[in-house]
């Protein structure tokens, strides 16, 4: 009888162990397990384990395209509609993605900044740094990470990031897929372009709030009394390429009690809804006495090969309006009014 009880206990233990083993083998092949392991690898600076659960080259490859999409949206400049620019980007992409991947792995491994590195081609390296400036990693901390969806061969994880400077939370959606070895990997940040645009908008909103008193002083110091736009197309046309000259004539008056000797300003073309169509920076060097009005005439060469220029050239410019936004004023007494630029 005791022998039967003994074997029964052994059977129960074996069944429990088998169940635990089955659950373990199943669990290590789930997105939730991969997420946790990626988090642990990041905390432990284990780049080998991290790359098992995060396909870094794939993430960076997708990030390259998404960052350019975001930059185009932020700057209102659709680079994807320019075949020449697009060709250059695709030519540089492999080198830039390789640099971004290696730098990411070095940071995960916590390699010191003074670690000797292979010399990088200056053009891809400069482009890499330009792309990276849109995502201020040093300002972001992980607030939460959880699996939000699992359907068949794909899964989505939600990463909540806190920007300590903006004091605001942002969400990154991580797309996960199972590889040939059965491990789940993060393959891309699905909403990276929108993430960057939202981050940029939050930076600009904070910048506008902090700079509001300065901008009010700038606008009070110099006021536009009249504006006029003209657009003259060049008669010489080369193939499909057209050129034109945009001229903005603005009468501006010094409303302060000190002479202005230098200023920078943006010339902006607006439609009838007040939406920005085109903008370019200009400057003025010369003395404007208190109460004096001066004519600010600026010209901008346009080329139909550039999408924004072509769009402007096709408009009835007489129906559009122009305004200036002063961004810097230097007075004769040495005083300077200039907003701080928080958007990097």
Residue ranges and their predicted role:
Residues 32, 43-70:
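Short extracytoplasmic
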Residues 17-38:
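Transmembrane signal-anchor/signal-peptide helices with a preference for the extracytoplasmic
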Residues 219-223, 278-279, 301-344:
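Terminal connector regions
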Residues 75-166:
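Surface-exposed, charged secondary-structure patches
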Residues 138-235, 286-297, 336-344:
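Low-complexity, intrinsically disordered terminal/linker segments enriched in charged
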Residues 251-257:
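Asparagine-centered strand-capping/turn motif at beta-strand->loop junctions
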Residues 1-17:
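N-terminal Sec-pathway targeting helices
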């Amino acid at each position: 009888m005791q022998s039967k009880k003994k074997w029964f206990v052994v059977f129960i233990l074996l069944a429990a162990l088998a169940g635990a083993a089955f659950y373990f083998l199943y669990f290590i092949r789930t997105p939730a397990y991969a997420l946790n392991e990626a988090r642990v690898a990041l905390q432990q600076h284990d780049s080998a384990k991290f790359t098992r659960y995060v396909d870094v080259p794939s993430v960076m490859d997708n990030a390259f395209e998404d960052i350019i999409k975001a930059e185009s949206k932020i700057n209102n400049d659709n680079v994807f509609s320019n075949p020449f620019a697009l060709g250059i980007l695709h030519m540089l992409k492999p080198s830039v993605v390789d640099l971004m991947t290696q730098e990411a792995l070095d940071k995960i491994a916590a390699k010191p900044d003074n670690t000797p590195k292979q010399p990088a081609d200056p053009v891809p390296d400069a482009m890499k740094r330009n792309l990276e400036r849109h995502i201020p990693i040093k300002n972001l901390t992980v607030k939460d990470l959880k699996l939000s969806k699992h359907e068949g061969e794909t899964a989505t994880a939600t990463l909540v990031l806190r920007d300590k400077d903006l004091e605001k939370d942002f969400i990154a959606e991580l797309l996960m897929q199972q590889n040939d070895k059965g491990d789940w990997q993060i393959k891309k940040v699905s909403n990276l372009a929108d993430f960057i645009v939202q981050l940029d908008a939050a930076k600009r909103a904070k910048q506008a709030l902090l700079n509001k008193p300065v901008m009010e002083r700038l606008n009070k110091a110099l006021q536009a009394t009249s504006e006029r736009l003209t657009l003259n197309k060049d008669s010489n046309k080369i193939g499909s390429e057209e050129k034109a000259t945009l001229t903005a004539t603005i009468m501006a008056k010094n409303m302060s009690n000190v002479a202005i000797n230098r200023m920078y300003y943006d010339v902006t073309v607006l439609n009838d809804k007040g939406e920005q169509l085109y903008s370019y920076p200009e400057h003025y060097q010369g003395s404007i006495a208190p109460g004096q009005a001066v004519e600010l005439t600026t010209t901008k060469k346009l080329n139909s090969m550039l999408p924004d220029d072509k769009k402007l050239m096709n408009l009835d410019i007489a129906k559009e309006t122009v305004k200036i936004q002063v961004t810097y004023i230097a007075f004769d007494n040495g005083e300077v009014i200039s907003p701080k630029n928080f958007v990097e």
